[in-house]
Structures are given as structure tokens and as C-alpha cells.
Amino acid sequence: MEMPRRFNTYCPHCHSHFEHEVEKVRSGRSSGTKWDARRTRRGKAVIGNAGRFSKVPGGDKPTKKTDLKYRCSECGKAHLREGWRAGRLTFQE
């Protein structure tokens, strides 16, 4: 799917329509231990299944939702919107 890099849309900070630049959200730094690792560690000292899942959590979906950030050209602030499913997303210059 192709999408324009810049287009006019509403800015919730300026309360008006201005040109926005679209960028993909980069992943942040990962935290120490995730919730499932903490849960497993809690279960190690008990009788039973030691905090494991009875069924393995599901795999990946065939397409991912878009994760985009819209940056206002007027105030410079960025906001997020709900993503949609797209196989491949490219930006038009």
C-alpha cells in the first residue's frame, strides 16, 4: 500500500488543519523482564506446572497493523492514530 509522506489533516494540539509528515514509529528500549518471565519465575518454587501455559500462545498474523506517527509542521508535535492492516506500507515523496 502506498501513502503520501505529507498531507493536510487535523492537529489535536493546534486545533486546526495543517500539513503533517508521516513517519513509522520506531521500537523503544525493551524493559528488563517481561510479564511472562516474571510469572514463570514466581511459579518455580511451587508444586504444579511451574507457571507455564497449558497451551502455547498463538503465532504471528499474516499482516501487521500500521504504526504511524503524524508530525505537525506548525507546532512540531506528533500524534498517533489507530492503525489498519496492511501487507507492506511505502511512502510517496
UniProtKB/Swiss-Prot annotation:
GO cellular-component term (any): ribosome
Residues in C4-type zinc fingers: 11-75
Domain of life, per lineage: Archaea
Alphabetic keyword roster: Metal-binding, Ribonucleoprotein, Ribosomal protein, RNA-binding, rRNA-binding, Zinc, Zinc-finger
Binding residues for Zn(2+): 11, 14, 72, 75
InterPro entries in alphabetical order: Ribosomal_eL44 (IPR000552), Ribosomal_LSU_eL42 (IPR053708), Ribosomal_zn-bd (IPR011332)
Ranges that cross the membrane: none
Cofactor note: Binds 1 zinc ion per subunit.
Pfam families: Ribosomal_L44
GO process annotations (BP): translation
Cofactor(s) of this protein: Zn(2+)
GO molecular function: large ribosomal subunit rRNA binding; structural constituent of ribosome; zinc ion binding
Keyword Ubl conjugation part of the UniProt annotation: no
NCBIfam families: PRK05767.1
Subunit structure: Part of the 50S ribosomal subunit.
Name recorded for this polypeptide: Large ribosomal subunit protein eL42
Source lineage: Archaea, Methanobacteriati, Methanobacteriota, Stenosarchaea group, Halobacteria
Gene this protein is translated from: rpl44e
